[in-house]
Amino acid sequence: MNNANFEKYVDLVFEANKNFNLTGFKTKEAIYQNLVIEILTLFKGYEKFFIDKTVADLGSGNGSPGIILKLLFQKIKKLVLIDSKHKKISFLNKLTKQLNLEKTVAICERIEVHKNHYDVICSRGLSTIIKVNDLAFSLLNSKGIIFHIKQSLDQYIEFEKSNQKNQFNLLFIKHFTSQNKKLILIALQKND
């Protein structure tokens, strides 16, 4: 893990955020805390889920969590950053180039064409757990894992009440509190 790369990531997001909305965080300190430190803390100790895996970050936007995970777990086989906004994809391509991230691509296309393609999917702010699971189910390989980053368990409780609970097994839930902000990492594994 190279701290200089995380600092470079923060600088690039900060500068690009002046021109178009990548994040609501307006200072380098806030970007570092919320887009880097939180991801490093939430995923600490979970490298085994990423080694030699094909990973997708749905709704990647500013590159967190995907790029942060690629910097943290350099043995990710391939990282695909997916977003529906061309401007954000252009930024992500520039970001991956400036950070010298190999086997990392940013795409702006219908994600449905990627059936059974990913071992791991990450989602932070894209949508509800149920909606992201709907998208992710056909994208994941057999026994693939999806990581949801949320601020409460409300959406997980709704997921538990839904028919989707038969499609995914809960691997774990990890809680993290930082600066009066609560985050939850929910890991679900596809049932086949």
Swiss-Prot record:
The keyword Glycoprotein does not apply. Transmembrane segments: none annotated. It is an enzyme of class 2 (transferase). Its EC number is 2.1.1.-. Pfam families: GidB. One of its GO terms (molecular function) is rRNA (guanine-N7-)-methyltransferase activity. Keywords: Cytoplasm, Methyltransferase, rRNA processing, S-adenosyl-L-methionine, Transferase. It is found in: Cytoplasm. Belongs to the methyltransferase superfamily. RNA methyltransferase RsmG family. This is Ribosomal RNA small subunit methyltransferase G. It comes from Mycoplasma genitalium (strain ATCC 33530 / DSM 19775 / NCTC 10195 / G37).
